[in-house]
UniProtKB/Swiss-Prot annotation:
The lineage of its organism: Bacteria, Pseudomonadati, Pseudomonadota, Alphaproteobacteria, Hyphomicrobiales. Heterotetramer of two alpha and two beta subunits. Pathway: Carbohydrate metabolism; tricarboxylic acid cycle; succinate from succinyl-CoA (ligase route): step 1/1. Binds 1 Mg(2+) ion per subunit. InterPro entries: ATP-grasp, ATP-grasp_succ-CoA_synth-type, ATP_grasp_subdomain_1, SUCC_ACL_C, Succ_CoA_ligase-like_bsu, Succinyl-CoA_synth-like. This is Succinate--CoA ligase [ADP-forming] subunit beta. Succinyl-CoA synthetase functions in the citric acid cycle (TCA), coupling the hydrolysis of succinyl-CoA to the synthesis of either ATP or GTP and thus represents the only step of substrate-level phosphorylation in the TCA. The beta subunit provides nucleotide specificity of the enzyme and binds the substrate succinate, while the binding sites for coenzyme A and phosphate are found in the alpha subunit. SUPFAM superfamilies: Glutathione synthetase ATP-binding domain-like, Succinyl-CoA synthetase domains. Keywords: ATP-binding, Ligase, Magnesium, Metal-binding, Nucleotide-binding, Tricarboxylic acid cycle. One of its GO terms (biological process) is succinyl-CoA metabolic process. GO terms for molecular function: ATP binding; magnesium ion binding; succinate-CoA ligase (ADP-forming) activity; succinate-CoA ligase (GDP-forming) activity. It catalyses: succinate + ATP + CoA = succinyl-CoA + ADP + phosphate; GTP + succinate + CoA = succinyl-CoA + GDP + phosphate. Its EC number is 6.2.1.5. Gene3D superfamilies: ATP-grasp fold, A domain, ATP-grasp fold, B domain, Succinyl-CoA synthetase domains.
Amino acid sequence: MNIHEYQAKAVLREFGVPVSHGYPIFKASEAEAAAKQLGGPVWVVKSQIHAGGRGKGKFKEASAGDKGGVRLAKSIDEVKDYAQQMLHATLVTVQTGPAGKQVNRLYVEEGSEIDKEFYLSLLVDRATSRISFVVSTEGGMSIEDVAHDTPEKIVSFTVDPATGIMAHHGRAVANTLGLKGEQAKQAESLVTKLYTAFLAKDMEMLEINPLVLTKQGDLKCLDAKMSFDGNALYRHADIQALRDETEEDAKEIEASKYDLNYVTLDGTIGCMVNGAGLAMATMDIIKLYGMTPANFLDVGGGASKEKVTAAFKIITADPNVKGILINIFGGIMKCDIIAEGVVAAVKEVGLDVPLVVRLEGTNVEAGKKIIKHSGLNVLPADNLDDAAQKIVNAVKQVA
């Protein structure tokens, strides 16, 4: 789960991490009060969306002006003007895709006098099963670009969970960033606080870009991006309360209500499969035969008729879906349950695209019988290869 920048900074503030003061606003009329509360003389007005590249982004609407999603204001009137322009406008960045995202909230923050910009992040390194620090002197820009152009400017190290964070980790960050004396001590303290927050809140990623050294000689987190382990949210009600569903895919939200593993993709063939491995294999073979999947959907091992019906409805709600492939290998999952769910869903929502069903495993004959006698226009398949070819050919014929 992701949260907004201003929410991430509030979390960091709980752990004593130095961040700039600011106020979120949801209406343009709130901008003046926020600016006056901060005092000035310089403010930063930041679009709050779940995507990076906001500063270099562009708004679709001409009324939003030609500046990016992060703007420097030198007067209260300028703060008010920016709020009026940016709120409810559509911001397009390198991470939003061409559709962009609507800006429904802004963060008005005090300006900072910046001497140097750095990059610092923590993430779960799956290769080592440890928390990894990624550090660079090249802050305020895309770390992907730095990794591509000057990889030698990125340093990373992992933390042994048996020892936890230690003083030498902080010194490693300070040395990488070229910090000495008082600034080195600040870096050591910051590293400990960030690691503590990362563990305490079950984060998957914490990115500070940029981490700045101000002209007053202080380290400050000027931006913050966080994502959390969804499986751990049950023990973090405070974090779960920060969820902004308007930033998420509506189909993925609906799928989560039924404990379905669903991810929207940009293809045209909807997939319903049980098991993540089989789901990925199904997506691969669709690609092999020249088309692309519209989603990843794993209904799990013990899905009920209602769960299968919900899954089918979610797939058909996607206007990009031109065909559907259901691929079930029944172990714990029974093929007749899948068949009943599919039939119920089709009768409820209708079927305007080709549907191929491949069933194998527990109660397979009963499942095939249910499909056969349903009166629905369903193409049966004997195996995965057969199923993929049939759905691809069927979609091409319709097109």
